[in-house]
């Protein structure tokens, strides 16, 4: 009857807040009344309020107290089901496994609701454009840090949608040459890399972290590193001059080798391999903006870079980054074989072969 009365009233954001506040009151009633049915059925007003709030938020321009109250009430319900479920089990004395499942479902529901409300509100306030490069990045960082400190893993997981939208915006800029500068297009990449490095420190500050929470943040870190690799390759293609694309790819590949020593992870090896392959494409494909390397020296450059990768991997004790060494050396082998078969081998080809023999002798000793 409360839900029917409120839904039929003149609807506004404040009416939605009253609906959700009704559910908050029913949740609090478990402590003095200990009636489990009030808590469960009392979520109906909040569900109505959340559904109806989407339409109102989509037409809301700017910031104000009414959207803030609505968001805070939804956030409060998400935290209640996440943090107070043990009290809910103790007071109601139901089946423990069943109560955990109920708390789990409502925590996911309200976590998704708060993220979707913020998303609709931001899109209504800021139309989807190049501005979302920084809006999505900043929002994701703020919510991820908050979820790590409050251990609200579902809120942190769902908040990645903001960064995903920023990444989609960057992809459109890089592929279709839409509006946007090189610095703005770098914001989502820097956000992902920075967040992947900061997450371990945030979890340490928050104290003991559950295994599921640690696994969730581990997946986020791994996804960030791999996604940032692909976005960096697009950024190089779009904003770096053609005669520098190869060298930038090589430098980033070496940076992945160093990062693998500083913070060991298998994905650094894959990132190094990806930049190596893109560098080879820029080196061998040429195009309208060829790199300033004579064609006869390309084979020698491939072998030389591969050897540098080999010794760098040994110095940092990172076996995963040996894939970049094999990539450049194999490319050098193929180029040498082609030059010999076509009888086009010159002095640089001989220098590359002698360089390989020299490294082989050094390695034996």
Cite the ranges covered by each PLM segment.
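Alpha-helical transmembrane segments of multi-pass membrane proteins
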Residues: 1-365
